[in-house]
Structures are given as structure tokens and as C-alpha cells.
């Protein structure tokens, strides 16, 4: 891989995509995973073909010809959101972590590479990410697009949870650079609890919480509407979530403290879509909205299992010989784990569950237990943990040997993408 340029990391999530180069501390671009295409029957602009002309000719390989694809009538990211009411329809090609619209995903990657990163794919190795339990057919589709449409030099598809574990090594709380741990990954659309043992995901023990950042935003919005605030738009609710919300130690005590505060409402300035500035009151939604992770019944009648209990269930359903390692290294990943005191609350509640089980066991057996170390790791890379873990991996000299190359693809076909070597502890 020495003759190739710096590897490219692309982490495409349900809500946002992160793009950048290996070895960097942060992605170069972060924007929504959304594409705007011309609505059926809308006037002006050429129709977008299912496969742009440059993709049909493998030998072109010139940046100038590829940049001409910017003229195609579709937009991605923030540019797409701006076109929502201008005769374009929006589509989110990834739902709950899985790619559902491959045609739109291919176009999304096209502009990601040629408009934003402005790179020649044949000169770079790529690291792409995938959710746990991603169907092997999805890996094949990804490999086919990357090698056939973009002619990339090499490809590695990594499980997001493993990369998040690697990213946690930057925390001072991590004393052992191990790829054994439990990843709590909460983004915009869904929350996954994923146990990993020596770099391998324990697929049978993965559990999902259908509550995440978007649900917190909707909950904030509903509380604003209940008070008839002058601005209860989704955008304002999202800003309040990100800037004002926090996790409290005890919801009952927090309500009691809130009621005693004379200045209980924060004055929050927002700007409406018409450009007029308005002030709204932000009250108990600051601590009540993130509480849905710990008391989900306040927002959902379908899912009632709190996050700490779910994490405990994941560890207890894993092989007994790795359980201590899974409790000892619980790593937070994703923007929805960034609420103040989120990690402290999760560790306290989970420790309480574990200690109660140990106490019951001691009462029944009459023997004294040595206890279990429960450690929830928060770190400064949480928001972009998956991308940063990929950046760490791809900058190592060994990375090229983990990748499948264009020559491998041409010899064996897309099925080679079904398996990738676990990169172990070489970071």
C-alpha cells in the first residue's frame, strides 16, 4: 500500500456521515446522510440516470471528467435539506443503520468522493463502517459499488463497535488496550448494545433499544408544544437538546429541586424560519427528555426496559468467561451519549443491578464474592468514536494487508467482502 495515498475513512450513519483521512483526529466533513432528487413531474433540470455516464466506463479515471458529475440534478447533506421545498424530494438511504436505497447511496458516495473529498478513488484504500449483524449481501453490494463504480484501490469494511472500542483507548480510564468490551452506541435513530470479545462481535447477545437522539428531540418538542411556546419547531427542539439537556441522578429529587427554584425556566433565544427572533422558556425538559434512556415508559408504551438493565442483560447472555471483561470496559459511542452525567448515571444504575445479584448469590451460597468491577468509559472522542477508531486503524502500516484489493475483487468477485481479517491489537 506504500505507493498509494492516505487511506480514506467513511462512516455513514442513519443521521450523519463522517468523511476524512486516516491519521487525523477528526473527520474533514460531517453532514446529514440525506439526498435530494428532483421530484417526479418537476420542471427544469436533467433526469438523473441510475448510473452516471462516467461509471459505465472503467477506464476514464480522470478527476476532470468526474467533477462534471456535480452538474447532475441531485444534492446531498445540508445542500439537500435546503432543496426540500424547491421541487426536490428528500430520501434517507440508511434506516436504523442499514442501507435501504442502494441507488441513492451510490449517488451519495459519488458526491462525497468527488465534491467534498475531491479524491481519485483508484489512488486510495478505503475503510467503510457497518452496523452489527450487517447482512453479507450488503457487504457484497458495497464492494461492487466501490470497486466497479469508483475503481477504488482497496477496501476494508469494519464493524462500528470494534472501531468504537479502539477509539476509547485515548481515555485515561483505559489501562488495557483490549478489544474486549461492551459498546453502548446511541446515535440519532437507534441505540445498540454490542458485546465484543477479542475483536469479535458476540452477535447472539446484541440488544437494541428503539430509543435514541431523535426520540429525545421529539420529546422536547412535545413538551414545548404543551406549554404553547412561540417556537416549537423540530430544529429548535434539537438545539435545546444539544445545548441544555442533561441526565440527573434522581428524577424525583430533580423535580423537587426544580419546583423550588425561583428562576426555574431558562430563557432561550431562537430564530424562526421567517427570520424573527423570539425567546422561549426551557423548563424541566432539560432533564426529563434524556431520562427516556433510564425510564423509557415516559416516552414509549412499547419498550419499557431501561438502558442499564439492557446492558446487564447483554453481558449476562454472553459467554461466562468474558463477562468480567465486558463489565470492566463499557464504552460509550455516538452523539446521544454526550448528555452531561450520562456515563455516571449508567455506571451507578448498572453497578446497583450487579451488586444486588451478587448479594442474592452470597445469601444463597453462604460464600463471599470478590465482586465485579463495573466501569463505564466516557471520552472526548465519543461523538465521532467510530470514525476516529477507523482513523487509528487505517494509519497503521499493517492496514493494507487487511484490505481486499481491486485485483482480489477481479479474481474472486464480490463474495470476498463477506469476510475480513480481524485487526487484533496492532493499533
Swiss-Prot record:
Where in or outside the cell?
A: Cytoplasm, Cytoskeleton, Actin patch
Q: Which Pfam families match?
A: Actin (PF00022)
Keyword Electron transport present in the record's keywords: the answer is no
Q: Looking at the UniProt record for this protein, which Gene Ontology cellular component terms does it annotate, in alphabetical order?
A: actin cortical patch; Arp2/3 protein complex; cell cortex of cell tip; cell division site; cytoplasm; cytosol
> What GO terms in the biological process aspect are recorded for it?
actin cortical patch organization; actin filament branching; actin filament polymerization; Arp2/3 complex-mediated actin nucleation; endocytosis
- Gene3D superfamilies per record: 3.30.420.40, Actin, Chain A, domain 4
Q: Which SUPFAM superfamilies match?
A: Actin-like ATPase domain
Keyword list (alphabetical) reads: Actin-binding, ATP-binding, Cytoplasm, Cytoskeleton, Nucleotide-binding
Extract one GO molecular function annotation from the record: ATP binding
Query: Into which family does the record put it?
Result: Belongs to the actin family. ARP3 subfamily.
Task: Please describe the quaternary structure of this protein.
Answer: Component of the Arp2/3 complex composed of arp2, act2, arc1/p41-ARC, arc2/p34-ARC, arc3/p21-ARC, arc4/p20-ARC and arc5/p16-ARC.
Q: What does this protein do?
A: Functions as ATP-binding component of the Arp2/3 complex which is involved in regulation of actin polymerization and together with an activating nucleation-promoting factor (NPF) mediates the formation of branched actin networks. Seems to contact the pointed end of the daughter actin filament. May be involved in cytokinesis.
Protein name, please? Actin-related protein 3
Organism in which the protein naturally occurs: Schizosaccharomyces pombe (strain 972 / ATCC 24843) (Fission yeast)
Amino acid at each position: 500500500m506504500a505507493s498509494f495515498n492516505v487511506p480514506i475513512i467513511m462512516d455513514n450513519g442513519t443521521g450523519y456521515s463522517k468523511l476524512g483521512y486516516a491519521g487525523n483526529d477528526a473527520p474533514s466533513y460531517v453532514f446529514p446522510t440525506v439526498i435530494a432528487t428532483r421530484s417526479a413531474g418537476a420542471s427544469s433540470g436533467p433526469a438523473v440516470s441510475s448510473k452516471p455516464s462516467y461509471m459505465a466506463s472503467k477506464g476514464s479515471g480522470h478527476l476532470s471528467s468526474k467533477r462534471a458529475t456535480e452538474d447532475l440534478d441531485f444534492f446531498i447533506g445540508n445542500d439537500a435539506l435546503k432543496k426540500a421545498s424547491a421541487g426536490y424530494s428528500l430520501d434517507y438511504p440508511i434506516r436504523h443503520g442499514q442501507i435501504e436505497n442502494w441507488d441513492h447511496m451510490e449517488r451519495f458516495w459519488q458526491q462525497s468522493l468527488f465534491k467534498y473529498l475531491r479524491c481519485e478513488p483508484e489512488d486510495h484504500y478505503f475503510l467503510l463502517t457497518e452496523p452489527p449483524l450487517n447482512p453479507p449481501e450488503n457487504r457484497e453490494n458495497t464492494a461492487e459499488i466501490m470497486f466497479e463504480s469508483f475503481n477504488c484501490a482497496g477496501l476494508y469494511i469494519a464493524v462500528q463497535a470494534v472501531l468504537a472500542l479502539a477509539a476509547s483507548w485515548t481515555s485515561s480510564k483505559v489501562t488495557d488496550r483490549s478489544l474486549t468490551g461492551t459498546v453502548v452506541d446511541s446515535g440519532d435513530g437507534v441505540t445498540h448494545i454490542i458485546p465484543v470479545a477479542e475483536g469479535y462481535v458476540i452477535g447472539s447477545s446484541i440488544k437494541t433499544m428503539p430509543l435514541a437522539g431523535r426520540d429525545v428531540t421529539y420529546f422536547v418538542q412535545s413538551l414545548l408544544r404543551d406549554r404553547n411556546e412561540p417556537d416549537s419547531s423540530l430544529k429548535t427542539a434539537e438545539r435545546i437538546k444539544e445545548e441544555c439537556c442533561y441526565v440527573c441522578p434522581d428524577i424525583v429529587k430533580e423535580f423537587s429541586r426544580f419546583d423550588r427554584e425561583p428562576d426555574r425556566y431558562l430563557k432561550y433565544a431562537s430564530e424562526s424560519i421567517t427570520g424573527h427572533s423570539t425567546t422561549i422558556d426551557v423548563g424541566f425538559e432539560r432533564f426529563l427528555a434524556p431520562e427516556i434512556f433510564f425510564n423509557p415508559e415516559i416516552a414509549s408504551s412499547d419498550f419499557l426496559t431501561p438502558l442499564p438493565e439492557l446492558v446487564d442483560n447483554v453481558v449476562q447472555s454472553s459467554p461466562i468467561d468474558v463477562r468480567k471483561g465486558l463489565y470492566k470496559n463499557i464504552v460509550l459511542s455516538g452523539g446521544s451519549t454526550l448528555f452531561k452525567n450520562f456515563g455516571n448515571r449508567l455506571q451507578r444504575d448498572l453497578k446497583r443491578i450487579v451488586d444486588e445479584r451478587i448479594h442474592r448469590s452470597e445469601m444463597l451460597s453462604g460464600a463471599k464474592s470478590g465482586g465485579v468491577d463495573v466501569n463505564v468509559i466516557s471520552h472526548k472522542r465519543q461523538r465521532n468514536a467510530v470514525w476516529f477508531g477507523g482513523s487509528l486503524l487505517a494509519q497503521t502500516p499493517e492496514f493494507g494487508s487487511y484490505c481486499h484489493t481491486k485485483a482480489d475483487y477481479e479474481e474472486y468477485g464480490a463474495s470476498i467482502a463477506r469476510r475480513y481479517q480481524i485487526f487484533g491489537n496492532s493499533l
